[in-house]
């Protein structure tokens, strides 16, 4: 009987320790080097045919915003826009844009520049 109590206690402690880091805190986005970017474009929906490419100035603004992230929050959100970053090596990253947040996967940062990126789409719509 003592053996079972010890085994249950050990199992309980191990379970609690192993679950402690289930959701590790991610503090910043992975940095983006603007030299490695082939292009960035924005869409209203994930599978939208209307695509707007970012200018060099817009790319720099976006890269600076992502690289300045200092605190990310884990959240679920329905994006208003999708931003696709295509790199010269073939990799791609997708960011979601809501009213006040920019996110990658489920990690978001609060920003005041979402209107800037939304206006790029609104002012330069073209069909691909």
Residues of each region from the PLM?
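Function-determining sites in protein domains
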Residues: 19-128
């Amino acid at each position: 009987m003592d053996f079972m109590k010890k085994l249950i206690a050990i199992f309980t402690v191990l379970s609690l320790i192993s679950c402690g880091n289930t959701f590790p805190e991610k503090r910043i986005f992975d940095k983006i080097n603007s030299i490695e970017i082939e292009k960035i474009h924005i869409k209203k929906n994930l599978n939208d045919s209307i695509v707007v490419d970012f200018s060099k100035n817009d790319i720099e603004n976006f890269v600076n915003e992502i690289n300045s992230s200092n605190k990310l929050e884990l959240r679920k959100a329905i994006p208003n826009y999708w931003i696709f970053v295509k790199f010269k090596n073939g990799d791609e990253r997708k960011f979601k844009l809501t009213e006040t947040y920019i996110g990658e996967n489920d990690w978001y940062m609060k920003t005041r520049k979402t209107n800037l990126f939304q206006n790029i789409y609104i002012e330069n719509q073209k069909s691909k």
